[in-house]
Amino acid sequence: MIDPSAKIHPSAIIHPNAVIGANVEIGAFTCVEDEVEIGEGTWVGSHVLIKGPTKIGRNNKIFQFSSIGEDCQDKKYAGERTFLEIGDANVIREHCTFHRGTVQDQSLTKVGSRNLFMVNVHVAHDCMIGDDCIFANNATLAGHVHIGDWVIFGGLAAIHQFGRVGSHAFIAGMAALNKDVPPYVMAAGHYATPFGINSEGLRRRGFSAEAISAVKRAYKELYRSGKTIDEVMPVLETMAQDEPAVALFVEFLKKNERGIIRP
């Protein structure tokens, strides 16, 4: 179904079962396949491929030569019905690749809202990405990666499969992540190590001086006290009672399985 207000270039190929919302624009030579839903106000440039089952929200911008909802590159994939969901107001620049999930996980790759994906970013199968993130050119997310909110990935940075990055973390360009990165932490290097707290990012997002100070104390407990994660958890849990910002640390570390980056 195509909304009458949609603007579709005559050379675009739209499957009869695709759902195209109000005021959607689709450029030349773009192909929208079966079981694709594109929400109101989304703009799709030329030469884009969108395969289903894929649901794209409202007011997104998808630039030329991107591949959205393609089969994953997991060798175990055998054609099962899996999904991709993209939220609202994302910007997906040229040559980005977003793959659907696998039945070995939740059969779903999910992207939140208001994210910026610069040129040639790869989002592999079963990734879960929050809101308000920035991924610079050629950032690469392997399968099953979980990214929180307000994360910044530098150009050419890459993360190992099943890796996690907590909200408000900053990943430097060309960093290689083989362990989890806790919330608020800046990471750089190959393999990446921690370089303090993303204080400037927190200030820009309206965190109070007291909250930032508490996050810094939590970072020191985690990385400079000489304690194991099990030993430091009671300290962080006590801190979180007085400062909610520290609770992100606690919740993230409770789910730790792969270990966290270390100096």
UniProtKB/Swiss-Prot annotation:
InterPro entries: Acetyltransf_C (IPR029098), Acetyltransf_C_sf (IPR037157), Hexapep (IPR001451), Lipid_A_LpxA (IPR010137), Trimer_LpxA-like_sf (IPR011004). Keywords: Acyltransferase, Cytoplasm, Lipid A biosynthesis, Lipid biosynthesis, Lipid metabolism, Repeat, Transferase. CDD domains: LbH_UDP-GlcNAc_AT. Its EC number is 2.3.1.129. One of its GO terms (biological process) is lipid A biosynthetic process. It catalyses: a (3R)-hydroxyacyl-[ACP] + UDP-N-acetyl-alpha-D-glucosamine = a UDP-3-O-[(3R)-3-hydroxyacyl]-N-acetyl-alpha-D-glucosamine + holo-[ACP]. GO terms for cellular component: cytoplasm; membrane. This is Acyl-[acyl-carrier-protein]--UDP-N-acetylglucosamine O-acyltransferase. The lineage of its organism: Bacteria, Pseudomonadati, Pseudomonadota, Gammaproteobacteria, Aeromonadales.
